Swiss-Prot record:
EC top class named in words: transferase
Gene behind this protein: nadK
Protein name per Swiss-Prot or TrEMBL: NAD kinase
UniProt GO molecular function: ATP binding; metal ion binding; NAD binding; NAD+ kinase activity
EC numbers for this chain: 2.7.1.23
InterPro entries, per database record: ATP-NAD_kinase_N, ATP-NAD_kinase_PpnK-typ_C, NAD/diacylglycerol_kinase_sf, NADK
Entry keyword set: ATP-binding, Cytoplasm, Kinase, NAD, NADP, Nucleotide-binding, Transferase
Keyword Transcription: no
Role according to the record: Involved in the regulation of the intracellular balance of NAD and NADP, and is a key enzyme in the biosynthesis of NADP. Catalyzes specifically the phosphorylation on 2'-hydroxyl of the adenosine moiety of NAD to yield NADP.
Classification of source organism: Bacteria, Pseudomonadati, Pseudomonadota, Gammaproteobacteria, Enterobacterales
Species this chain originates from: Pectobacterium atrosepticum (strain SCRI 1043 / ATCC BAA-672) (Erwinia carotovora subsp. atroseptica)
Highest taxon, organism lineage: Bacteria
GO biological process entries: NAD metabolic process; NADP biosynthetic process
Length: 292
């Protein structure tokens, strides 16, 4: 029987010895099982794996069939922005805190991953956002996000006055500390903390969630994922930024606008066969258990 995966990439930015131990275990275990393994360069250096085939995230995206990301959701988000450009499936081993995107338990990773490598897994596509800071006489600054794009002050907190246009039609104006534009994947992250709705991953929707608005009538808004969102500013006298997944910041200057739309790329995320989104919500958010 043909294997669904032949070349496997090992990805992550370990901050703890336990995460490094998981990387090392996976490398030796996958190699012993006969898989071609490509390990991210930084991990190979930290583990002193001198003879291991190494590569960048882009190399792994181009050459591997499956990327195993070891770490927390932050590691997954950073890897996803690169790996989403390639035809590669991605799965995560949780060495972080909540682990909404990293399903595999590190204590049982071998058995769970063995089932996945045999073809027993669930697959889904998570769409991403693309953010542009639109400049008059210069190229746009562009980045992508799998969780959210956030409009926020720079170094000093201050009120922001802006208008929101959806599909080039005026939707609303707002005075607030900022605005969170979240995907369904990001609806359980920063957006949730700000009072935004939880969107199941299969929804083709985007949530717009105000941050500390100056009026009680400002409420979260859910729109179609095909919509284009444009932010216009009355006057920028203080630092202003948009951030993507809290990892990449793009400054916004006077006279510039922000455009946010669905990216042409998506993350091919896979899960163990017994994965349940609602079980994940229940366990991560501490929801009540079944009564009967």
């Amino acid at each position: 029987m043909n294997k669904p995966f032949n070349c496997i990439g090992i990805v992550g930015h370990p901050r703890h010895p336990t995460a490094l131990a998981t990387h090392e275990m996976l490398y030796h275990w996958l190699t012993e099982k006969g898989y071609s393994v490509l390990i991210e360069q930084q991990i190979a250096r930290e583990l002193n794996l001198k003879d291991a085939p190494t590569g960048s995230l882009a190399d792994i995206g181009q050459q591997a069939d499956l990327a195993v990301v070891v770490g927390g959701d932050g590691n997954m988000l950073g890897a996803a922005r690169v790996l989403s450009r390639y035809d590669i499936k991605v799965i995560g081993v949780n060495r972080g805190n909540l682990g909404f995107l990293t399903d595999l338990d590190p204590d049982h990773a071998q058995q769970q991953l063995s089932d996945v490598l045999d073809g027993h897994y669930l697959s889904e596509q998570r769409f991403m956002l693309e953010a542009h800071v639109c400049r008059t006489n210069q190229p746009d600054s562009i980045s992508t996000a799998i969780n959210e794009v956030v409009l926020h002050p720079g170094k000093v907190a201050h009120m922001i006055e802006f208008e929101v246009y959806i599909d080039d039609r005026f939707a609303f104006s707002q005075r607030s500390d900022g605005l969170i534009i979240a995907t369904p994947t990001g609806s359980t992250a920063y957006s949730l903390s700000a009072g935004g709705p939880i969107l199941t991953p299969s929804l083709e929707a985007i949530a717009l969630v105000p941050m500390f608005p100056h009026t009680l009538s400002a409420r979260p808004l859910v729109i179609n994922s095909s919509s284009t969102i444009r932010l216009k500013f009355s006057c920028i006298t203080n630092d202003l930024e948009i951030s993507c997944d809290s990892q990449i910041a793009l400054p916004v200057q006077e006279g510039e606008e922000v455009l946010i739309r669905r990216s042409e790329h998506h993350l091919n995320l896979i899960h163990p066969k017994n994965y349940s989104y609602f079980n994940t919500l229940s366990s991560k958010l501490g929801w009540s258990k079944k009564l009967f």
